[in-house]
């Protein structure tokens, strides 16, 4: 099983990247926060979760071990596959997902595309006592929610989407910025967001 991959980034796609290692190109599915930091032609080191199914072998990659740890917890829940877990980690920062699970914030979790209320409730029920508290460190309880509901957050997301950036990356970056400072204006979020997305 592949647990770690080090190589050159050949291509960054919508939901994955191609990493060349030992002359072989591996397609690795990654959350938006990881994809946004991969640059074609540059080296990359990814923590890998190798998922084997009847019809395919899939690689999921993360720049940090916290994201991998949370991914493992999410896919351990009945009815939650790797793609849905990746959607959660793309739409919200790791700290916001962890905080949502710890605090039982079903509304926040179900605001992510593809995550219904019942799935969010099941995630909370099964993971509330399993998520390490350090994963939520530094995240105000409303951090993830702020990105999705504040006027500044919504305006910043709309503006960045209009500039052609991908929605999962935009939502992740804006949520991360608002988690650091919930009082930021839309202009500040757009300016800082552009710096992170380019």
From Swiss-Prot:
Q: Is this entry keyworded Nucleotide-binding?
A: no
Annotated region Domain I: where? 1-63
What is any one GO biological process for this UniProt entry? Answer: DNA repair
Name the segments for region: Domain III.
150-198
Specify where the region named Domain II lies, as residue ranges. Answer: 64-142
Judging by the UniProt lineage, the source's domain of life is Bacteria
Which InterPro entries has this protein been placed in? DNA_helicase_Holl-junc_RuvA_I, Hlx-hairpin-Hlx_DNA-bd_motif, NA-bd_OB-fold, RuvA, RuvA_2-like, RuvA_C, RuvA_C_sf
Name the SMART domains for this protein. Answer: HhH1
Q: Where in the cell is it found?
A: Cytoplasm
The principal localisation class reads cytoplasm
Q: Is Glycoprotein one of the keywords?
A: no
Function recorded in the entry: The RuvA-RuvB-RuvC complex processes Holliday junction (HJ) DNA during genetic recombination and DNA repair, while the RuvA-RuvB complex plays an important role in the rescue of blocked DNA replication forks via replication fork reversal (RFR). RuvA specifically binds to HJ cruciform DNA, conferring on it an open structure. The RuvB hexamer acts as an ATP-dependent pump, pulling dsDNA into and through the RuvAB complex. HJ branch migration allows RuvC to scan DNA until it finds its consensus sequence, where it cleaves and resolves the cruciform DNA.
The entry's protein name is Holliday junction branch migration complex subunit RuvA
Q: By which gene is this protein encoded?
A: ruvA
């Amino acid at each position: 099983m592949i647990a770690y991959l080090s190589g050159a980034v050949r291509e960054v796609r919508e939901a994955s990247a191609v990493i060349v290692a030992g002359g072989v190109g591996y397609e690795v599915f990654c959350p938006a926060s990881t994809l946004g930091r991969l640059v074609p032609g540059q080296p990359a080191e990814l923590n890998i979760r190798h998922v084997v199914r009847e019809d395919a072998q899939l690689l999921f990659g993360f720049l940090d071990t916290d994201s991998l740890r949370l991914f493992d917890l999410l896919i351990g829940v009945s009815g939650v596959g790797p793609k849905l877990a990746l959607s959660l980690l793309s739409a919200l920062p790791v700290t916001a997902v962890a905080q949502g699970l710890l605090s039982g914030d079903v509304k926040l979790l179900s605001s992510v595309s593809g995550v219904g209320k019942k799935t969010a409730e099941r995630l909370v029920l099964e993971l509330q006592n399993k998520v390490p508290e350090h994963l939520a460190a530094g995240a105000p309880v409303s951090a993830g929610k702020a990105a999705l509901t504040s006027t500044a957050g919504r305006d910043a997301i709309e503006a960045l989407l209009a500039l052609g950036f991908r929605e999962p990356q935009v939502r992740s970056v804006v949520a991360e910025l608002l988690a650091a400072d919930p009082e930021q204006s839309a202009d500040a979020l757009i300016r800082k967001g552009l710096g992170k997305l380019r």
